[in-house]
């Protein structure tokens, strides 16, 4: 079969948030663009098996949890009735709607889409194998935005249909009676939130000493108390062996010191131990692209690799693996390719664990401030002091801000609570714009709201708080 010849200025490999953002911005800047995607549904992991479908399920989980809370105040409903097919159908409609939207945007921008697997021939051409046709695409510049894949463990029998990864789990193939999640990171916690709400008995096993160990323990302790009755988390533990039985998967679990060992039978095991770069099929060694020890492509502040006309963005270049970071990188790399002197230099990148309650953070943590010998001060407001939180049955939360005592500027913040991710934007903007505590304290916030906790935290630092005891007033 003779390959079709295609010549273009810019090629983007991957149609996730990083890839399509780069493609569309390049087109808007007047460049001729070809977008390569291996699957027929555009949007990458985020849209198809990640961010969007999981948030749909997490919304369902939140509603279920909120309904159960109403029994505390005299309102109860009949037994929960879950129509799994209807849930799956609605999820599919959401994905198709957004994927179709991306296709329409590409068409209106004259971005050509080629479906197939790409691999490098040399630094200025790739081979793309589609379902029916193959292509040799020549280009001036290329952007690798192929994303990431679920990391695998060598001792896991992945050929067993009872072993899931997060991409499969988000499709809700079934609701297991007993579910083991290996990995207590954000993905593991979100999956536990979903399946426990739907009725599964969920255990999480993680080999670290605590969940999200880079965050401050005071805020994480509030989260753990809130989910204490939803699922079990076993720290400092590892899965040693999995035995495939007819009636389930027999898991040999041991603590890190190997002193305490036990066997547990599970219906399903979900492996969520992190992600690895999706580069194996690209044949990047042919062009000599440099990677780090974990296989992530090395880039500079303009996302250029060691090959001058080859760029990389998104998950494929490493942590933090966040769609919104990738989108921003897509915009920057397009500006660079078009000849502008743009660089990736954000002060902060917000992060959210979309559990219930949510955990959202940005900037420096207290632990980091201490390690870096920053003269800082913490200012926190517990949500059980917020009228909106108490009246909305979501009082298990906290808003914690970190201020630099020399400049009074806000340098970090963490929120645990319902819709914490939606509240984080003000803190992110405040850090990015160099706001100090007075800026936040003197900005009138609506009452009663959850976001006024940011204002109150700033008032505590300023020593002007009236809604709580002012510990800075000397009598």
From Swiss-Prot:
Q: Which keywords fit this entry according to its UniProt record?
A: Cytoplasm, Disulfide bond, FAD, Flavoprotein, NAD, Oxidoreductase, Redox-active center
Q: What is its EC number?
A: 1.8.1.4
A molecular function (GO) term: dihydrolipoyl dehydrogenase (NADH) activity
User: What processes does the entry annotate via GO biological process terms?
Assistant: 2-oxoglutarate metabolic process
Major location (coarse):
cytoplasm
Q: Could you tell me the superkingdom of the organism this chain comes from?
A: Bacteria
Q: Where does FAD bind?
A: 37-46, 55, 118, 315, 323
Annotated binding of NAD(+), by residue: 183-187, 206, 239, 272-275
What are its cofactors? FAD
The note on cofactor binding and number reads: Binds 1 FAD per subunit.
- Quaternary state and interactors: Homodimer.
Q: What is this protein called?
A: Dihydrolipoyl dehydrogenase
Q: Which organism is it from?
A: Buchnera aphidicola subsp. Baizongia pistaciae (strain Bp)
Gene that codes for this?
Answer: lpdA
